[in-house]
């Protein structure tokens, strides 16, 4: 038997049927799916050095299980004391099984470790069916060693779906188990 991540198995066995039932799709191909998860972490340029960049890349790589890359600034910005070609952020794009494994760890391990957690914001959709989740501290992931962590950066996690409507994407992420805020738990 082949290995299948838990959210992927859940999607194939239960979520597709629930989405077809709720939105009356005529074909299985119309059912929205999670295409990719993009994790982006901005780096403070004022404390920039190669060691900071390498530590941040190693941390994101440990969290996601996939090598992260850094993004360079495209032009000089004197207001930010930024030179062209300076690394300003780190990103990693997750697809297929690695994406589902990260989603499982995020929902079941990392988000419950957030202090005073009541759910994620349900209004962070972009109008095209994509959801953005901001995390202020990376130490919620158990892969991060807090003793050796010098700079604690936050990150932005973008869930890209094949849906063009926020309502469908929200229901898809809800069925995956993403805990949205409700009036009861606020």
UniProtKB/Swiss-Prot annotation:
An example of a Pfam family matching this protein is Ribosomal_L5_C
Q: Does the keyword Transcription regulation apply?
A: no
Superkingdom: Bacteria
UniProt source species: Karelsulcia muelleri (strain GWSS) (Sulcia muelleri)
Q: Does the keyword rRNA-binding apply?
A: yes
Which family, according to UniProt?
Answer: Belongs to the universal ribosomal protein uL5 family.
Single GO cellular component term = ribonucleoprotein complex
Q: Which GO terms describe its molecular function?
A: rRNA binding; structural constituent of ribosome; tRNA binding
Complex formation: Part of the 50S ribosomal subunit; part of the 5S rRNA/L5/L18/L25 subcomplex. Contacts the 5S rRNA and the P site tRNA. Forms a bridge to the 30S subunit in the 70S ribosome.
What does this gene product do?
A: This is one of the proteins that bind and probably mediate the attachment of the 5S RNA into the large ribosomal subunit, where it forms part of the central protuberance. In the 70S ribosome it contacts protein S13 of the 30S subunit (bridge B1b), connecting the 2 subunits; this bridge is implicated in subunit movement. Contacts the P site tRNA; the 5S rRNA and some of its associated proteins might help stabilize positioning of ribosome-bound tRNAs.
Q: Biological process GO annotation list?
A: translation
User: Know the name of this protein?
Assistant: Large ribosomal subunit protein uL5
Q: Report keywords, A-Z.
A: Ribonucleoprotein, Ribosomal protein, RNA-binding, rRNA-binding, tRNA-binding
Q: Which InterPro entries match?
A: Ribosomal_uL5, Ribosomal_uL5_bac-type, Ribosomal_uL5_C, Ribosomal_uL5_dom_sf, Ribosomal_uL5_N
